[in-house]
């Protein structure tokens, strides 16, 4: 990396300009108070922001309005006083500062500032990456599908959301760990084993002899796994299970042995399938964390003991250990409730952590798991991506972190709304191939992975998605990812064409980008300036979808620029500046697509 390129490492021009504006206005206020123009007072809280209309400046501030009560003067008088005491802007990024309307202060950025944006985006191939997060350790846990069956459309959305969120956090300077929590213990595994065992017995004795209970998993995948196990093991488990009524069978040692054998066979296969499909979806986890290890290591018991010691739990008459959930959850929102004994009203509900039979609940393991993240492994933040149907669990989980001596604010939950698959404008429920509910496997066989990852990240987590299967397979501008990829390929084509005509790009350090003043050029430059801060905002708001929308707008702005500003045949100095602008846009599109693990074609 050259010294010139190092100048633009971790470069965030928009934030730098906002910070400089705040510093100038703060200095002006202090100077005005020092000479008595404004009365001495604590500086009011004020805003510096990017106005919607560039006619109102590149940056605007409400400091005069915010200070009206503090300084007991009209906002216009305050604004004029601040302007009179403003430090020289000669060596700043600003070319002009003015008062507008009732007292807004508008600041205009210099052409040399905008030129620096072009050069930074052109010279720094990782333009957009900043050190905003200062290396803070963040854990992002997402998908974490039960290994008892195939992944569904919610997992497809959660995979794209969690992976793209991890990417914007990484690009914002956080030390990110991507994690999958494998629910390989508890009731769902018992249910999985029971479902497999009944299907296995049906294979040899028929469905009438061993009807599948309603609470068992009904999917065809259970039959397939049980059939595979039968092919490997034959009927050696059947005889020991015969001659018992249903209740006796399900409590018998023979049935328990059959369940254990089936789970030992089927669970690793399902986990391997999860890993295979998520790998195909381009998700690479740093940690696969097994719930079972929390039980085997004694971590669940240790957490329950700690909560008892802290008075957050108590023992009920039947021996169950109860957690005082409402006491801690109320701070964070919804408190789970139950009916009073007479059924007339609702009261706060305490939660069972350990049942009367001594078996811990899923909630106890969940507390132990998050304690492991925040205390044992020392993450500054644990971010969980959950389906919106789990909203009732958020407050009690955050409250549990407080109860155990941690900070519930260090656990953040991103709630994700539903996905509706659409074809020909109609909802699609079943796979044409299997006749069953559409799985992630089915989706990735029909839809290009680039489209799936981009389209599932087009909306913020709180919005539902109608995923259009017809749109996802299109190879034209109706498909947003194609539109963005085409903009990149078009720039590559322009650069190659110029080279073929003997026009070589001289390098960013030799370009005079102050020559770029056309409206379409300035639109592009303003977008380039915003890019690093857009990534930071996406990270802070846990909303990577804003980057998808940004890059679509950038592609549109580039097409407008190319339609109105000639590169071929332009004045040589202007031509070099426009090539630098093209390369800057190309770098940003490349960085967005690679950040989100989407292919970046150079020709289409």
Where are these regions (language model features)?
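Non-catalytic interaction-recognition regions
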Residues: 2-115, 123, 129-604
């Amino acid at each position: 990396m050259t010294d010139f390129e190092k100048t633009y490492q971790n470069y965030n021009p928009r934030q730098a300009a906002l910070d400089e504006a705040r510093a100038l206005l703060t200095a002006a206020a202090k100077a005005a108070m020092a000479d008595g123009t404004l009365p001495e007072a604590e500086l009011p809280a004020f805003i510096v922001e990017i106005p919607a209309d560039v006619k109102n400046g590149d940056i605007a501030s409400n400091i005069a309005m915010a200070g009206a009560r503090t300084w007991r003067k009209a906002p216009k008088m305050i604004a004029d006083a601040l302007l009179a005491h403003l430090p020289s802007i000669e060596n700043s990024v600003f070319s002009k500062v003015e008062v507008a309307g009732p007292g807004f202060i508008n600041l205009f950025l210099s052409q040399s500032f905008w030129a620096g944006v072009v050069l930074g985006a052109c010279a720094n191939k990782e333009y957009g990456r900043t050190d905003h997060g200062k290396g803070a350790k963040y854990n992002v846990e997402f998908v974490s599908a039960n290994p008892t069956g195939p992944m569904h459309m919610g997992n497809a959305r959660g995979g794209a959301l969690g992976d793209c969120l991890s990417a914007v956090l990484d690009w914002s300077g956080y030390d990110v760990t991507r994690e999958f929590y494998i629910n390989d213990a508890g009731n769902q595994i018992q249910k999985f084993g029971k479902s497999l065992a009944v299907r296995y017995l049906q294979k040899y004795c028929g469905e009438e002899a061993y009807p599948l209970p309603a609470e068992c998993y009904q999917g065809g995948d259970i039959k397939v796994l049980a059939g595979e196990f039968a092919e490997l093991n034959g009927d050696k488990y059947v005889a020991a299970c015969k001659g018992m009524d249903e209740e006796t069978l399900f409590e018998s040692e023979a049935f328990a042995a059959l369940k254990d054998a089936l789970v030992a066979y089927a669970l690793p296969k399902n986990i391997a399938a999860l890993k295979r499909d998520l790998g195909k979806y381009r998700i690479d986890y740093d940690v696969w964390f097994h719930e079972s290890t929390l039980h085997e290591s004694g971590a669940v018991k240790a957490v329950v003991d700690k909560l008892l010691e802290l008075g957050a739990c108590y023992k009920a008459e039947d021996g169950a250990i109860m957690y005082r959930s409402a006491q801690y959850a109320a701070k964070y929102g919804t408190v789970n409730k139950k009916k009073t004994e007479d059924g007339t009203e609702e009261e706060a509900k305490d939660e069972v952590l350990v049942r009367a039979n001594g078996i811990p609940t899923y909630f106890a393991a969940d507390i132990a798991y998050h304690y492991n993240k925040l205390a044992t492994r020392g993450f500054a933040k644990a971010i969980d991506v959950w389906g919106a149907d789990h909203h009732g669990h958020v407050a009690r989980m955050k409250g549990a972190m407080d109860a155990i001596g941690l900070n519930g604010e260090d656990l953040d939950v991103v709630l994700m709304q539903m996905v509706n698959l659409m074809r020909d404008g109609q909802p699609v429920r079943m796979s044409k191939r299997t006749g069953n509910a559409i799985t992630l496997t089915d989706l990735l066989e029909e839809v290009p992975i680039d489209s799936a990852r981009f389209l599932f990240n087009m909306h913020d987590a709180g919005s539902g998605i109608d995923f259009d299967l017809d749109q996802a397979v299109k190879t034209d501008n109706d498909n947003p990812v194609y539109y963005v990829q085409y903009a990149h390929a078009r720039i590559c084509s322009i650069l190659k064409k110029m080279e073929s005509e003997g026009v070589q790009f001289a390098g960013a350090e030799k370009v005079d980008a102050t020559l770029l003043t056309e409206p379409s050029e300035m639109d592009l430059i303003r977008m380039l300036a915003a890019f690093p801060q857009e990534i930071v905002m996406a990270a802070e708001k846990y909303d990577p979808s804003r980057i998808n929308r940004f890059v679509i707008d950038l592609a549109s702005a580039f097409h407008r620029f190319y339609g109105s500003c000639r590169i071929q045949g332009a004045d040589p100095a202007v031509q070099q500046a426009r090539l630098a602008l093209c390369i800057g846009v190309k770098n940003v599109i490349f960085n967005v697509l690679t950040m989100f693990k989407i292919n970046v074609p150079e020709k289409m």
